[in-house]
């Protein structure tokens, strides 16, 4: 009886060890804490002198709003929230992990009175793939317009859109604005925890 239990115990320990080591590493904020689906974070450039945080701005029409970068590096933009995409993680695991599909939304209200969840769409004027907030218009066959990943990159992280195939998200200038979309080089970022506003 004892001789049968030992291999079973060893096999169980091996399975637990394998499942623990198989999880991708967590994404960390600027204070060294793991990103959580319960938290809000500013998405800021990893290096100073490269503009401010991510915000929402109109492109041609007042709505929908596109994801843009603040030109003034003192402006942090709006905080975002990450949630696992399509049940990618166990419900009890609230940690945001590298190379794992997530949904991203701004934790802010807009004049458009619609969702602030991100998705990638083709801009009608230029055909460029931009990150847009709000409802999906003309979803692709894959249904993954709102699937993103955070990948370790250089001294920070990069955001990746995994709509059809995974593409880096970069910032491209168009007039006075810098827009987030599928472009090179990738926009290298860090995540700063947003603190709740003190009561007035």
Curated annotation (Swiss-Prot):
Residues 1-22 form the signal peptide. PROSITE patterns: SOYBEAN_KUNITZ (PS00283). It holds the Pfam family Kunitz_legume. GO terms for molecular function: alpha-amylase inhibitor activity; serine-type endopeptidase inhibitor activity. The record marks 88-89 as: Reactive bond. Transmembrane segments: none annotated. It comes from the Eukaryota. Keywords: Alpha-amylase inhibitor, Disulfide bond, Protease inhibitor, Serine protease inhibitor, Signal. Disulfide bonds join 63-112, 162-166. The keyword Cell membrane does not apply. This protein inhibits independently subtilisin and T.castaneum alpha-amylase but not barley alpha-amylase. Belongs to the protease inhibitor I3 (leguminous Kunitz-type inhibitor) family. This is Alpha-amylase/subtilisin inhibitor. It comes from Oryza sativa subsp. japonica (Rice).
């Amino acid at each position: 009886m004892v001789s049968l239990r030992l291999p079973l115990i060893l096999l169980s320990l091996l399975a637990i060890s394998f499942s623990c080591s198989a999880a991708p590493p967590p994404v960390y904020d600027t204070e060294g804490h793991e990103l959580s689906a319960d938290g809000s974070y500013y998405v800021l450039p990893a290096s100073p002198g490269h503009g401010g945080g991510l915000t929402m701005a109109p492109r041609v029409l007042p709505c929908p709003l596109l994801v843009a970068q603040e030109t003034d590096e003192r402006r942090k933009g709006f905080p975002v929230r990450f949630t696992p995409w399509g049940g990618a993680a166990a419900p009890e695991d609230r940690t945001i992990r590298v190379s794992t599909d997530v949904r991203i939304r701004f934790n802010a209200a807009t004049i458009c009175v619609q969702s602030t969840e991100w998705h990638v769409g083709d801009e009608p004027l230029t055909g460029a793939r931009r990150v847009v907030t709000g409802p999906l218009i003309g979803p692709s066959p894959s249904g993954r317009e709102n699937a993103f990943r955070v990948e370790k990159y250089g001294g920070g992280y990069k955001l990746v859109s995994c709509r059809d195939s995974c593409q880096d998200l970069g910032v491209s200038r168009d007039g006075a604005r810098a827009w987030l979309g599928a472009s090179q080089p990738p926009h290298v970022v860090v995540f700063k925890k947003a603190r709740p506003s003190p009561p007035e």
